From Swiss-Prot:
Catalyzes the oxidation of 5,10-methylenetetrahydrofolate to 5,10-methenyltetrahydrofolate and then the hydrolysis of 5,10-methenyltetrahydrofolate to 10-formyltetrahydrofolate. GO terms for molecular function: methenyltetrahydrofolate cyclohydrolase activity; methylenetetrahydrofolate dehydrogenase (NADP+) activity. Homodimer. Its EC number is 1.5.1.5, 3.5.4.9. Pathway: One-carbon metabolism; tetrahydrofolate interconversion. The gene is folD. This is Bifunctional protein FolD.
Length: 295
C-alpha cells in the first residue's frame, strides 16, 4: 500500500478560497491586527505572509511593529487599545517575543472574542466545555485534513494524539472528541507507545521528535496527520546543510498508511488559512453577522 499524500498547500488554498467567498458575502470587511515585537527574521516572514493572505482574502490588515526593547507594559497597552477598537475583529501577537517579555501575560490581555489564535485561558476553557469560541489554528487544520482524507463524518474513529502540549496536543484531542471520535492522548510516559499508535484510524504525532513514528507503528490504511516540524542535518546537501522532517518517518509510514501529510507542505500551510477563517468567525460573532455557508 502506498499512502495518498495529503497536500496541505492545496487544502489550505481551498480554505482561503472559502474565506474570500465568505468575506465577499459579508456586509463589511473583517479586520485582523498583527503585533510584531522585535526583528526575528522568521517572524518577519510569517507576518508578511499573514498580512498578504489577509488582504488577498478581502480583509483589512493592520500591522503594528514594536522595537525589540519595548517593555511589557507598552506591549500590553497596545493590545488593550486594539481590544477597545471597534474596527478590529482579531488580534494576533506574533511569537516568540524577545527575551524579557512575558508572552503568556501578554496573550492573556487579548479579548477572548478577538483571540484568533485561540491561546487565551478563556478560549481554552470554551473549547474544553464545548462552548462557542475561537479554536487554535493548527489543531483545527489537523481536523480539516483528517476530514479531507476520511470524509466529513469522523464519528467512531479511533484517534491517537502523541503529545499533550497546550498549543497542539490537548486542543487537537478536544477537537477530535467534538467530532465524536474516541481519543487517546499519548505522551512520554505512555506504556508501549507503538502498540497504542497501531490502534489509531487517525494518528496525530505532535511532539517535536524527528521521525519518531515508524511504519510499523501505523495501522494499515490509517490517516497520519503529522504536526511535527523538525530541522535535522542533511550532509547529502553539503556541509552544514539541514532539511525539515516531521515526527513521522515519511517513507516507512507511507508504505502502510492510507493517507499521510508531508513535512513541509502538510499541516503548516493550514495554520494561516485557519487564522483567516477565525478572523471571519470573530467578526461575525462580534458584529452580529450571519456566518456565510462554506466556512
Amino acid at each position: 500500500m502506498t499512502a495518498t499524500r495529503l497536500d496541505g498547500n492545496a487544502v489550505a488554498a481551498d480554505v482561503r478560497s472559502a474565506v474570500a467567498a465568505a468575506v465577499s458575502a459579508l456586509p463589511g470587511q473583517p479586520c485582523l491586527a498583527v503585533v510584531l515585537v522585535g526583528e526575528d527574521p522568521a517572524s518577519e516572514v510569517y507576518v508578511r505572509n499573514k498580512v498578504k493572505m489577509t488582504e488577498a482574502a478581502g480583509m483589512v490588515s493592520i500591522h503594528h511593529r514594536l522595537p525589540a526593547d519595548t517593555g511589557q507594559a507598552e506591549v500590553e497597552r497596545l493590545i488593550e487599545s486594539l481590544n477597545a477598537d471597534p474596527e478590529v475583529d482579531g488580534i494576533l501577537l506574533q511569537l516568540p517575543l524577545p527575551k524579557g517579555l512575558d508572552a503568556d501575560a501578554a496573550i492573556e490581555k487579548i479579548n477572548p472574542d478577538k483571540d484568533v489564535d485561540g491561546l487565551t485561558e478563556v478560549s481554552a476553557g470554551r473549547l474544553s466545555l464545548g462552548k462557542p469560541g475561537l479554536r487554535p489554528c493548527t489543531p483545527v487544520g489537523s481536523v480539516i485534513l483528517a476530514k479531507r482524507a476520511l470524509g466529513p463524518d469522523l464519528s467512531g474513529k479511533n484517534v491517537v494524539v502523541i503529545g499533550r502540549s497546550i498549543l497542539v496536543g490537548k486542543p487537537a484531542a478536544l477537537l477530535f472528541l467534538a467530532e465524536n471520535c474516541t481519543v487517546t492522548i499519548a505522551h512520554s510516559k505512555t506504556a508501549d507507545l507503538a502498540n497504542v499508535c497501531r490502534s489509531a484510524d487517525i494518528l496525530v504525532p505532535a511532539v517535536g521528535r524527528p521521525e519518531m513514528v515508524r511504519g510499523d507503528w501505523v495501522k494499515p490504511g490509517a490517516a497520519v496527520i503529522d504536526v511535527g516540524i523538525n530541522r535535522i542535518p542533511a550532509p547529502e546537501k553539503g556541509e552544514g546543510k539541514t532539511r525539515l522532517v516531521g515526527d513521522a518517518h515519511y517513507e516507512s509510514c507511507a508504505e502502510v498508511a492510507g493517507f499521510i501529510t508531508p513535512v513541509p507542505g502538510g499541516v503548516g500551510p493550514m495554520t494561516i488559512a485557519c487564522l483567516l477563517r477565525n478572523t471571519v468567525l470573530a467578526a461575525c460573532a462580534r458584529r452580529g453577522w450571519t456566518v456565510p455557508e462554506g466556512l
